[in-house]
Amino acid sequence: MGIKQDNGKSITVTISEGVTGTLEGTILTFKGPKGETSRDFLSPLVKTELKNNEVTVSIPVSKRKYTRMFFTTIAHIKNMIEGAKEGFTYELKICSGHFPMTVKKEGNEVVITNFLGEKIPRRSKIVEGVKLDIKGDIIIVNSPNIEDAGQTAAN
């Protein structure tokens, strides 16, 4: 993934090998070996174009409001390309002191029983499209979408 800045108002991001991109209206989608990510870039401030395996993001003027959306859009695009190519992984360690707790996956939820001695089990949602594995005292969260993987880890 390479980045090329034409001037202060336009940046071109080159799509990595093994990743394909499509732009339908305002929805940008990347497909790669680790999965597919898509996002709606509906912003009147930023213009997004996809040509020749490159995504060009541009703004009409260099004002603070425009540049904030400009660089945020570029960061989202870079994360989407990286997620489609390599994916994002979070590893969480289950630590229990005095009270032995158990963690198991049930459907689209993680159930934590006996957390700090509580009688009622805690349930945390697994965001759709996220793969979660529990191996001993390690929880592994995988997803091509960084936001979904991070939200599942936070839950």
List each model region and its residues:
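Ribosome-associated RNA-binding proteins
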Residues: 1-155
